[in-house]
From Swiss-Prot:
One of its GO terms (molecular function) is cellulase activity. Residues 23-397 are annotated as: Catalytic. Residues 398-423 are annotated as: Linker. This is Endoglucanase EG-1. The record marks N164, N208, N281 as: Not glycosylated. The keyword Signal applies. It comes from Hypocrea jecorina.
């Protein structure tokens, strides 16, 4: 079977329909973006559904010439086919993708992303997709969130230590850097940048013959798994960024029983994340002065981890890059919503969920462990909403606690006295491990299963 006919980089996007119609049955891979309904909200008008979809990143695609010779090789481009931008644009075609095989499925307002997919040769392959939110015209949705809020539901229960389910904002161009040699642009996932200044084969849609990094402001709304999470702004100048950022991680801030399976934010179940970008005058025209994180679960507001709220109001590491004011300007001009799932072969994601950052051991996040024990690891994002602060969720105060309990505790719960009967851990909750002193009896229908010396879980 011949490879599919695809979009030439120099062919207008409007020609896509004609190219698809000319393809032979069973031989083509057209670019069909999975629909993902999102919502734009106002206090006066409520939330209105948006006609949006997702598109897979440009670098995940096959590029080839008319004879199906690859235009890319390990470490860059085929210099015979791509000696310069104009020749590359003339010679090379870019494929559409099979989204389901790439670990991406959508249903209504819900997006599921898998780390691994079954391989045709047996076993599993790491697909680790990265996606961008696209409008009905084939350009990126530009979220202008200064003085606004962003809310979404997320299910991280299937993400173990070492996995990172991410939802963040990147200051990419609306058209993905489309130009005369790359008319595919955003419609094919072009133009990625972030605060790590990645060096890619294409830089904002242009062949990167000078091997420059591509820096831009990055606002990490969520980097997390079922054990830890972080909220982190990364401000940039044109050529450099605050790559480390100044984030808030509940565990890293000392609130070690706030976030996790069975904890205050119970990651064994779906929950809602609300992120508010507060300005000095309370409107989108003001200067960004703080970023606030809130949670809901089962429609009920969850108390913040920190007294006074989980808020980032200063960013010393970003002072050389303009601090929060720079991020506010990026949020005002518009940023692209990015979704990803990934793991880390070198550092095992320890910066996110191990040591001072989380409860995971230094080796739990090894991708070989993840694949062996959690080949179906995935994240689900749903009900993505943005708009006026206070417009994207229905807030309900938490019920009053029983007389014998407190509203919030910074230490893991245990039985109240040494003579009390054993407490019962919930499904997915921790039930054993070195240093663990909490509930060791699992709820009915589950048993305490060993994962490693530091962690056993009710399954």
């Amino acid at each position: 079977m011949a490879p599919s006919v695809t979009l030439p980089l120099t062919t207008a996007i409007l020609a896509i329909a004609r190219l698809v119609a000319a393809q032979q049955p069973g031989t083509s891979t057209p670019e069909v973006h999975p629909k993902l309904t999102t919502y734009k909200c106002t206090k006066s008008g409520g939330c209105v559904a948006q006609d949006t979809s997702v598109v897979l990143d440009w670098n995940y695609r096959w590029m080839h010439d008319a004879n199906y010779n690859s235009c890319t090789v390990n470490g860059g481009v085929n210099t015979t086919l791509c000696p310069d931008e104009a020749t590359c644009g003339k010679n090379c075609f870019i494929e559409g993708v099979d989204y389901a095989a790439s670990g991406v499925t959508t249903s209504g307002s819900s997006l599921t992303m898998n780390q691994y997919m079954p391989s045709s040769s047996g076993g599993y392959s790491s697909v680790s997709p990265r996606l961008y939110l696209l409008d009905s015209d084939g350009e990126y949705v530009m979220l202008k969130l200064n003085g606004q809020e962003l809310s979404f539901d997320v299910d991280l229960s299937a993400l173990p230590c070492g996995e990172n389910g991410s939802l963040y904002l990147s200051q990419m161009d609306e058209n993905g850097g489309a130009n005369q040699y790359n008319t595919a642009g955003a419609n094919y996932g072009s133009g990625y940048c972030d605060a790590q200044c990645p060096v890619q084969t294409w830089r904002n849609g242009t062949l990167n013959t000078s091997h420059q990094g591509f820096c831009c402001n990055e606002m990490d709304i969520l980097e997390g798994n079922s054990r830890a999470n972080a909220l982190t702004p990364h401000s940039c100048t044109a050529t450099a960024c605050d790559s480390a950022g100044c984030g808030f991680n509940p565990y890293g801030s000392g609130y070690k029983s706030y976030y996790g399976p069975g904890d205050t934010v119970d990651t064994s179940k779906t929950f809602t994340i609300i992120t508010q970008f507060n300005t000095d005058n309370g409107s989108p025209s003001g200067n960004l002065v703080s970023i606030t994180r809130k949670y809901q679960q089962n429609g009920v507001d969850i108390p913040s981890a920190q007294p006074g709220g989980d808020t980032i109001s200063s960013c010393p590491s970003a002072s050389a890059y303009g601090g929060l004011a720079t991020m506010g300007k990026a949020l005002s001009s518009g940023m692209v919503l990015v979704f990803s799932i990934w793991n880390d072969n070198s550092q095992y994601m320890n910066w996110l969920d191990s040591g001072n950052a989380g409860p995971c051991s230094s080796t739990e996040g090894n991708p070989s462990n993840i694949l062996a024990n959690n080949p179906n690891t995935h994240v689900v994002f749903s009900n993505i909403r943005w708009g006026d602060i206070g417009s994207t969720t229905n807030s309900t105060a938490p019920p009053p606690p029983p007389a014998s309990s407190t509203t919030f505790s910074t230490t893991r719960r245990s039985s109240t006295t040494s003579s009390s009967p054993s407490c019962t851990q919930t499904h997915w909750g921790q039930c054993g491990g070195i240093g663990y002193s909490g509930c060791k009896t699992c709820t009915s229908g589950t048993t305490c299963q060993y994962s490693n010396d530091y962690y056993s879980q009710c399954l």
